[in-house]
Amino acid sequence: MKSKRSTNKAIMKKYSQGSREAQEKQKNDKKNVPVLVITYFVIFIFIGMMVHLVKYVVVDADSDIANSYNKRQNLYAETVIKGQIISDDGVVLAETKTDDDGNETRVYPYSNMFAHAVGYDSNGQAGLEMVSNYYLLTSNQNILYRIYHALSDKKDMGNNVITTLDYDLQSTAYNALGDNDGAVVAIEPSTGKIKAMVSKPDFDPNQISSVIEETANSDSSCLLNRATQGMYPPGSTFKILTTLEYIRENPNYKSYSYECEGDGIFNSVSIHCYNHKVHGTVSLEDSLAYSCNTSFSNIGTKLDMDALNKLCGDFLYNKELPYDGYYKKSSYTMTSKTDKSLIPQTVIGQGETLITPLHNAMVMCAIANGGVLMKPYMMDRIENCDGSVVKKFSKDSYGRIISSAEAQTMTELMLSLIHI
């Protein structure tokens, strides 16, 4: 009996000890929870930092270094002779000449003709000289030559930038613009390749120091690239958007008819056609073909101005453009709340609407490419000094702007211009 009681006491004692141990363990576990949370949090942060570091090294580092605002690029010039800028058809547009004393001079063989597109590389930078500076100051020359140059204290040859620019098209556009101020932009709709970009007044990049000195206080500097930064009323080119909006709001648009008398009053505003020419009875197709101002002002009084505003937004008015160079945003302000007297002028591309030649070319390209806008670009590829391709720039779609059916309809209407 005594033995049994002793056994029970031992069991109770053991159970009591086990219970206390369990309670102690539970208390310790509760104390350890914050420590574990902090540990996992630190591990999570560490993993995140490693992922970010790997991403930067593999993906972002080159683009950051290539950024035109990165001043570290200038350090490359100490060991690399800046490469050439070459047209798509093989014409050298910019190169570095070195004299017997090792002095380097950036030379532009065609001076004014490519001034704004190619830019300059002295007293600052502009154009391709700025955008592609990193590539031009990077060398992928044969490794044996680079070792030899390092041992003999000579510079490596920089890579060459092959552009999308076409010499013949650029020359044609440059000569066609003549002595007029303005700009010409030619883009390949299916790819976004900029084939020509001319701006006037122009300048000689070989004489950039004197040009900057002479134009420092000018309100209309020849250094301004009017193709990307010049703001102009779109004029009759805007009638394409007015036409498209009318078609959207009027499925029976083919039955449209208007009697043009050469001038008219719309929303208390007097509008007249060019030279007050009387076009007579015109359809929608005729209105676009003859660029009939009175017919379009008549159309404008019937349109939903908010819908037209949205259409303009779809074509990137008031928005950022998918373009790497400097540019100004175009402006369109007309809504249903705007003074109605502005409608007749707005729908024919006058009034307060402003657009850059580059942007206007993009609008036309989207229509010509079945409603899809391709991002405009001017660098086709990077080659080393031996002609081997180092980097290729591919075409890139911004996205669909209008439906393919709408693009087809507008293309057919625009073709009527050549049949009048």
Regions from the language model: what does each represent?
Residues 1-212, 222, 231, 256, ...:
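Periplasmic/cell-envelope proteins involved in peptidoglycan metabolism and beta-lactam response
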Residues 2-5, 9-16, 89, 149, ...:
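Beta-lactam-recognizing serine transpeptidase/beta-lactamase-like catalytic domain environment
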